């Protein structure tokens, strides 16, 4: 056995028999579930970390990726790579597809490209690892050797894949110099993963769904062409289902270890299987799963549906004459039925995002709330007070600090501050206690924290989140409209509805934003939101108006839905954007919503007391 460290990349097998890596973020999520052990239920819901993967669940025991809406199953595996290779450095190589978006290369190809890039080669020929492409680093382009078609490529930095250290068989270690790995291929076994791999390969090689170029890649020659439009992907497979090492020009940085059970330390990443998946693969995979595996998948999917707020409505056999009584509807029913669990058939409810049309004469102002709109402009800089003067209002000096750590710099309070950034004007050994919550810090650290924030005259305790002063945000300029419409929300039949319309245009980021001077986008505006016109609903509206004036409703950042950066996003105060249903979790009925949003506003320092200090 050899003590070694490696980065772990989780991968899934696509319909062409190529292993595709999950992204680093997804891999880290899988590892967290694995480390949680049996209490996590043995399944990983990928949509929790990447909304684009919402249909997918991984069953860790059978090592399969399950697509909920189609029932397609794909094998997954845990692969090891040299920490000095691309995944160990957070480097991702991507090619531009016909739609203008970027697609990551398969892990082996990306490692090969990065190795040549680090050696400062002007270009690299990928023919030796089975792809008829040249990567030209001077132009950052990919050239098809046969058609001479060129595509752009790029190198970007992402999270580093998870690192593991432990004992590994010597035959699974990587060689110290470039060249093919020396371990012999493992013989095929009868575990579900290997059966699935072999079934996919058999379908592709023997007249399956893959194009001719892909089937050629599966031959023993190991040299083939990558089909267009997909860019260079994983290395060729031989007929035993084992991935072949790269040729002489590529670094052999792979630890060829394929595990059927997922130990701790894995990471997840790129998009899951394409929608045009090989259905035969899914059927073969389903047949290999035993009752316990099916039960786990069914229960995992039920958890996802319940968490998303999808209601269940019993449905009968619609035509009454079918011999199936009733027909199985939905993959959850198929799974639960196959696992011997009771099945209740449901009809999916209709998504209702907007109310029925409302005429101008039907729109009314809200009693007790003046005006029907509110605008915000750019931040007005506060003058005349230094950070030290601001903090002086909230702090009491501590002459004899306790033998504890400052939770900002993690140095002892009895020692000088460990902050190493721009030097505040206070002494690094001064210690202060926040007046209301009583938490103690180096004053030096608090000044540095204030300078790194919004510098609006307020301070938030980093331990308990108590807010001192009036907290403001970085919301870009926009308009908030609010009025009554003559329709009721589900769960609130006795009152009308307050409609809020937010409008924010795209623009240029200011000094308080993540990238000053850079443009930002504003997707999905105007955004329509809904509250019941009840006493508590009007209370929430008044507090939302305070939050709007303090620029706390929106911020500029990275969208958790699309992954787009430098765009307008919600800022921790949830809104209901679904009028007549609750399929997305952002609609009605929701008995706890008004209380929850009041708590979220209070966490931003906005409560009923705030309304007495702000305009209506």
From Swiss-Prot:
GO BP of this protein: negative regulation of innate immune response; Notch signaling pathway; proteasome-mediated ubiquitin-dependent protein catabolic process; protein K48-linked ubiquitination
PANTHER family: DELTEX-RELATED (PTHR12622)
Originating organism: Mus musculus
Free-text tissue specificity from the UniProt record: Expressed in brain, testis, embryonic fibroblasts and thymocytes.
Name of the molecule in the record: E3 ubiquitin-protein ligase DTX4
Gene Ontology terms: cellular component: centrosome; cytoplasm
Domain WWE: 1-78, 79-155
SMART domains attached to this UniProt entry: RING, WWE
PROSITE patterns registered for this protein in UniProt: WWE, ZF_RING_2
Domain of life of the source: Eukaryota
